[in-house]
Each structure stands twice: as structure tokens, then as C-alpha cells.
Amino acid sequence: TGDEDVFPTYLEVSFSNVCNLKCTYCAPEASSRWVEELKAHGPVKLIEGTPYEQWAQGYQDLDSLQYKNREVNPYVDAFWKWFPEAYKHLKVLRITGGEPLMSKETLKTMDFLLEKPNPDLEFAINTNLMVPDKLWDQFILKLVAMRDAECVKKLTIFTSVEAWGK
């Protein structure tokens, strides 16, 4: 009838674009460092007439991306109202970013999973692994607790190696 609730089985969520890096393949929507770069130096100069020229000009209004950096985010608030019911139907939950380990919502999500185990859920996080030690330690403690509690079917960490050395 169209009135039924529909819940996803796969959910990818980004709580924030706060990030400590500006990877070459990333964009301001997913990296606050790219927002800072574009505000300081303007859009990247691209070859005129290419499809990418129009893409770069789309970043003229960088303030529209700042809601993701605010302490109070209406989208995150809405997520937490919706998630407890949707969670029951999930098979895969993946947190992306920004850098997810820099968002308090990531640890809050992990706490939720510990409190409400789902043995059918695959839980994944994308991370650059370059966060301060305090955040890293908190994350590892939560991961170990999740593993020991067997509160999810599978834990996966996705990362990339953008560069190495100095």
C-alpha cells in the first residue's frame, strides 16, 4: 500500500567530513582538510573545457559543507532516531568519513553494537590509520571488546596507503 517501512540491509554512513588528511583522490564533502585548502587557495585550476572544470567550480560555496563539522548536526540527530529500528534489519554497516575515528559518533556506534549484539551483522570502518594515539587507543579497545563479545559476525577495517616516509 506504500505505507510500509522499508529498511536497508546494507548501510554506509558518514557522520562527518572532519579529517586530518587531504588525500589526492578525496573531495571536500569527505575531507575538512580539503575545505581548508580550497578556502585558503581557491579551487584547483583545471584545463578549460574539460568535464572536470565544471566539477571544480561546484566548490565555490564551501560553507555548505560546514554542517558536517558542527557539534550539532540535524542529520546525525535524525540518524540516531532512525537507527535503532533500522539496525535490526542490517546485514552490513560501514562507517566512512572524513576520518571516522575523529568522530565521536563512531565510538557511540561501536558502543551501540556492544549493547545490542547482532550476530548476522558485518561491521566495517574506513580509516586512514593516522589519528592521534588517544583516539587510536580508544578505537582498539572497542574493537577488542567487540571481538571478545562476538557482538557482530565480522569486523573489517578498510584503509589506504597514500604515501610513506617523510
List each language-model region with its residue ranges.
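Generic structural signal for well-ordered alpha-helices
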Residues: 80, 110, 140-144
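Donor nucleotide-activated moiety binding/catalytic core segment of transferases
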Residues: 4-5, 82
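Conserved Walker B catalytic segment
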Residues: 109-115
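A short, Lys/Arg-enriched amphipathic alpha-helix followed by its capping loop at the start of a domain
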Residues: 85-86, 112
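C-type cytochrome heme c attachment motif
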Residues: 21-25
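Conserved RecA-like ASCE ATPase "motif II neighborhood" in helicase/translocase motors
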Residues: 74-82
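Core AdoMet radical
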Residues: 8-18, 29-74, 87-105, 116-166
